Amino acid sequence: MAPAIGIDLGTTYSCVGIFRDDRIEIIANDQGNRTTPSFVAFTDTERLIGDAAKNQVAMNPSNTVFDAKRLIGRKFADPEVQSDMKHFPFKVIDKAGKPVISVEFKGEEKQFTPEEISSMVLTKMRETAESYLGGTVNNAVVTVPAYFNDSQRQATKDAGLIAGLNVLRIINEPTAAAIAYGLDKKAEGERNVLIFDLGGGTFDVSLLTIEEGIFEVKSTAGDTHLGGEDFDNRLVNHFVNEFKRKHKKDLSSNARALRRLRTACERAKRTLSSAAQTSIEIDSLYEGIDFYTSITRARFEELCQDLFRSTMDPVERVLRDAKIDKSSVHEIVLVGGSTRIPRIQKLVSDFFNGKEPNKSINPDEAVAYGAAVQAAILSGDTTSKSTNEILLLDVAPLSVGIETAGGVMTPLIKRNTTIPTKKSETFSTFADNQPGVLIQVFEGERARTKDNNLLGKFELTGIPPAPRGVPQIEVTFDVDANGIMNVSALEKGTGKTNKIVITNDKGRLSKEEIERMLAEAEKYKAEDEAEASRISAKNGLESYAYSLRNTISDSKVDEKLDASDKEKLKTEIDKTVSWLDENQTATKEEFEAQQKELESVANPIMMKFYGAGGEGGAPGAGFPGAGGPGGFPGAGAGGAHSGGDDGPTVEEVD
């Protein structure tokens, strides 16, 4: 069976793991980081994903996309989307009722759906796994927040498809963390576990019971807009005010200054989890003013006091919903980078009367860890006793039901029902001789359907004339393990039936759209690779030219070279260097042609020099042109300098 990976697709950071040899490996990306920013950037020349995208955000804020998870599977008119848009530096537009991100890429305007942006992050995670495993990876388990509704789950699955992944299952993040935890701690009897997940952008609390390898989610609550970024914002505002006080200048209108300040604040926040104070030093932050300051942990805690305290409300709600007293919670698990903050750990511990939360699993990695275990189970990896014994029960995040007379919400599947599940109920007509019924499916907890979210609707027609209340219409809700729902209605007298799969009405991508996006993803991948080889050819030429220049300015070489040869070579090198300065965006072929031209002048001259008994005459001893490719620094080798140390080694520049 091909390997299957687990991906934690986070709002701000993502993480990937694989289950191998009875243990989980969390896989580091090409920058050596075990988590990758969920950022995608578009520039004049290329597309960047992950660290590279986040690192250049200050220079390119309007074309650097993040937080796609806040838009995925939602409608443009969704109040959440409207309020989020106010804070995004990139442009979100309405396209057929869905939010679409508009950026400038390679000089023209391009539009991407949130699914496409997320698919790019997923592709990055997949490639991270592939380069580690040395083979292709197709199967994955991807996690979503517990309160994601049906369309958000579908859209996440679509993002996986566009990334060329076969999504084995979408599972809830707390469930994944619980699996990670369940493998670490096998205990007798039923255990109540509270998962406290405070990430970069969101906050989720879930209560699970674990018994003999069976996980059940009892209840979930949270705040979609609370996380590390909010703590960063408090620091940013604090320092903007300090800058105003000290320098009488307002830097908040300058996007780049704000971005640099935010990066420094994120770093400071992380430091304050282990140190009592830290300093911030940013050169030329705004209008040439250097900003040097410091902040203590106590001040940081005070700035975020209300936010930290507010994390306790969902904890209370989860216990209330699950009808469990806090003294009955056996284990508390901390997940998400923000749970490293000592004050948060203390609040949690105090709430549970001094009980120490469990932090044995790296909080950034716990979700990917569990997803990787689940991926191994679903892909049939039964090599491990530990994966063999897990059974997973997820829950419906919101109640689902239909509208009955007078706009009343009649739930068939209650919130927190274990899924997969199937429920049927019989309804009837509201008027005499009513020829058909409109089945409208809603999700939500409110008593009236107008306050809930319409998932979809369909009609069942051809009901024979009869007095009201006589026809029997059986409505069945069937929710599968991915939380995808089939709703059907059957008129018992005639056997007439109709059904809906709750996908399209909620703005799910059509098959054609997914295929188009898949093709585009391939195209972008090819473009990314072409750009990389173009840069490599440019660096190769640059490295070769500068190496030659260094070589002929070396006094030992100087005295052995013919003056006219040296002049000829110098002119050619200068010509190449000035061409390079003016043609940074040339094609790979043009760079290679320039290199050939330079070599045609340099090689005969350098051969004479070696013929004259110059030192280091061994092929490949590091002199440009010394006996074949071994000695061309960067000739086709992406700027790698082989052999001696005469020329500078050129590294790729961001």
Curated annotation (Swiss-Prot):
Lineage start: Eukaryota, Fungi, Dikarya, Ascomycota, Pezizomycotina
Gly residues: bias regions: 612-646
Keywords, alphabetical: ATP-binding, Chaperone, Nucleotide-binding, Stress response
Cystine crosslinks: none
InterPro entries linked to this entry: ATPase_NBD, Heat_shock_70_CS, HSP70_C_sf, HSP70_peptide-bd_sf, Hsp_70_fam
Domain of life: Eukaryota
Keyword Protein biosynthesis tagged: no
Region annotated Disordered, chain positions: 612-654
PANTHER family with a match to the protein in the record: HEAT SHOCK PROTEIN 70KDA
Protein's UniProt name: Heat shock 70 kDa protein 2
NCBIfam families attached to this UniProt entry: PRK00290.1
PROSITE patterns, sorted: HSP70_1, HSP70_2, HSP70_3
Organism: Paracoccidioides lutzii (strain ATCC MYA-826 / Pb01)
Family: Belongs to the heat shock protein 70 family.
GO molecular-function term, one example from the UniProt record: ATP-dependent protein folding chaperone
